Amino acid sequence: MCVLQLGWKWMQNLIVEVMWTQKEEQKAGINQNLRREEGKPNQQTVWRRAKKRRMNRRARGEAGGRSKKMRMRVRKNRREEERKLSIPGREQQRKTSQRRRSPSSCSSSSDNNSDDESMSEGEMARLKEEVEEKKKLIATLRNKPWRMKRRLKCLKEAQEFVEKFEGALGKGKGRRLYAFKVMMTKKLIKFNRDFENFKTACIPWESRIKEVESHFGSSVASYFIFLRWMYGLNLVLFGFMFGLVVIPELLMGIPYGSIPRKTVPREEQDSAMDFSVLFEFGGYCKYSILFYGFYNNQRTIGFLQFRLPLSYLLVGVGIFGYSLMVVIRTMARNANEGGDGGDEGNFTFCWKLFTSWDYLIGNPETADNKFASTTTSFKESIVDEQENLKDENIHLRRFLRLLANVLILCCLAGSGYLIYAVVKRSQDFAKRDRNELTWLQKNEVEIVMSLLGLVCPPLFEAIAELEDYHPRIALKWQLGRIFALFLGNLYTFLFALFDEVNGKLENEKQIKNQTVWALKEYYANYTLQYNITENIPPPNIAPADVIRGPCWETEVGIEFVKLTVSDIQVTYLTILIGDFLRALIVRFLNYCWCWDLEAGFPSYAEFDISGNVLGLIFNQGMIWMGAFYAPGLVGINVLRLLSSMYYQCWAVMACNVPHERVFKASRSNNFYMGLLLLVLFLSLMPVIYSIMTLPPSFDCGPFSGKDKMYDVITETIDKDLPPFMADIFSYASNPGLIISVVLLMVWLAIYYLNAVSKAYQNSNLELKRKMQMQRDEEKNRRNNKDSTNQVMKDLEDLLPNKSLIPPPSVEETEKPAEQPSKSSKVTGKPGAAASGKGVHVQKDVSLAAANPRAPVTRAPGPRQPGPLPGNPRGPPPGQGMGRGRGGPPPRR
């Protein structure tokens, strides 16, 4: 009790003392704050500061040594120890030491700051490496297979580390330069990122094409990608033609109405503005900048002395050169993507199932498009898999394919004969008065060619059903047949057209002779009347009254423009009637009709890939050929492609349905590019023929007054270049040599690119084949091991009382082998494993009758591990491993 009383009193005194001490400290703090505000320090504070200074001096004297040299040595040793530590550890140690350090160590903080500022080169290098590693972690953090919580934590720590220690690299020598380099690096990274985003945003119609691809597959989207590429090509050609030919003539040439070639003839002026005349590109359209005959033959025009005839010829040929370069470059770039569109990789469906979704999508519409795109890609892969597993009668299939090709050849021959006959009829109509002809007779050629391009592709598609190719291969055959159709029609048209040109040249010679005789008669009469032989003024005849030649170049240009415009009209009307009106009928009349309009006839239309692609390619061929005779044709084609993108995208999304067998398109459009390259060469030949062979018209165009069009080049060489250059060009400008060398170089380039592409594809296929062989060999090894174990188990059952079975080793006792279940049934062929490879004996087939089960008298063995994937569950056949494991109950 006494002890408790003493303890209680001691606690009371302690509590009272603590409370009194707190009150005194509170009073002292208040008085100190008041005196600080008044600017007068407290006497107690002065004594405390003096005491602290004495303690600091004593601590430095005890720890640092008795001299300045000793203190410097201690400081140097401490600095060396800190250098051995990593930078983050050093910082942590510094923080810990600062927390442990007493208030008396505040005076040494300046020394630590001086140590920070004087880092060695090794520390700087280590710090740079760690900062770069953190930056790489920030850049590649998205690819890490971590949880989002861990990613955010690592990102925050890495960013704090970079922000903290990146500034330390700039301390000391070269601080400003390093800070400037860091700032410029960050600015450059941000600029590159913004520029990439800007380039992506500047890709025209990207979102529209992605939407089409998500609903209709990559095969339909490949057409719109090709259409966008064609639009870019024609935009560049439009810039060349208008910038170097049309605009110089408009700004620096002779104004309209001053010379006969820029004036409507007197007999045509009354009907020059009629719609029927303008619709056929006659009247004022014929004598405008759209066509060849409008341009003057002056060697130089304007104050710039611009050589318009030379520019016209070089631009007309340069269009082909630029197009050839772009097409070959695109084919070479696409060759690396390679393949025929089939996915030759393994585990296709697993990759699509687990990696198709984009988890950064935040827009519901984008999510719907991505869902549709994933579904379509599964359909494409299923079609490829079905085609690989298809079994067919090869002899019947060959017969049907031969029959289909014979029918298609008959169609091609009939279409060519029809076009030739129609062009011959049009030549007969041209000799008659145009007022006596009907609209059908005037436009018979264009109508027949457009109708053949409209009717033959569906006919070819119906015949191709006999062949039963894979959809991708069937598309290539369809493209080739329509290509042959369009090519035959086009060249039949050209042959007939050049026959007409020869007739116009004969007519032009007669008109030229009449004009020459009229001028000679005028000069002779003027000389006799005024007795003057020099400085005779030309005849005062109005430009509209001058006798004109037929100007065959303008007539050829008009034919190409009419073909292009009629093709646009037929295409748009086909979409409007065949797709839109058909979709309206199916959509609104399906509820009140006798049969199901969606499932039966007429149903919704499918997008015709082959017809649209070939139409686009041959329309471009007509642009290449017609641009030399009608410079305004390139501008018309640019407007056509621009409107086609919006019009056809709307028609596909609103009126069409996906193909019944959705297939994957080629990862590169090289098949389309190959057809385009062939059309480019075929389009170049008529233009080269007219430049090198046919004489230009004498009263229209920039080459009038010359024997051949290429004489402009020789004239420029003779008048603008030194004489020795003229000799060199005269030897090198042999037309046969030039054409042969150009064609040889082009074909060599194509052969080289094709060979390189095939070599890369073959090497890739060989590597894939080797990898597949190794994988199959590994599977066979595993399956053979399993089947061998099964045979050995069955042989064990045949041995009497298992007297010949060797005793199991220690390892086998510890790790018993897994055995399949007796009750499970094996499906498939006998002797085939589950994967289709290796030797595998059926489990239901036994080599002999089962031995009688002996009673189990030993202790149960260790429990077996669970079955592997693909193996059945349940007890194994044969003698049990222990009590209650498949054998009879033990006898008691």
Curated annotation (Swiss-Prot):
Q: Where is the composition biased (Pro residues)?
A: 862-878
Composition bias (Basic residues) maps to 48-58, 66-77
Topology with respect to the bilayer: Multi-pass membrane protein
Tell me which domain of life the UniProt entry assigns to the organism this sequence originates from.
Answer: Eukaryota
Record's subcellular location: Membrane
Give the record's keywords alphabetically.
Membrane, Transmembrane, Transmembrane helix
Listed GO MF terms? mechanosensitive monoatomic ion channel activity
Location, primary (coarse class):
membrane
Pfam families, per the entry: TMC (PF07810)
- List membrane-spanning regions: 235-255, 275-295, 308-328, 403-423, 444-464, 482-502, 616-636, 671-691, 736-756
Question: Which spans does this entry mark as compositional bias, Basic and acidic residues?
Answer: 772-785
Tissue expression from the record: In adults, expression is restricted to the hair cells of inner ear and lateral line organ. Expressed at higher levels in the larval lateral-line neuromasts than in the larval inner ear.
What segments bear the compositional bias annotation Low complexity?
Answer: 103-112
Functional note: Probable component of the mechanotransducer (MET) non-selective cation channel.
Q: Which PANTHER family match?
A: TRANSMEMBRANE CHANNEL-LIKE PROTEIN 2-B, TRANSMEMBRANE CHANNEL-RELATED
This one is known as Transmembrane channel-like protein 2-B
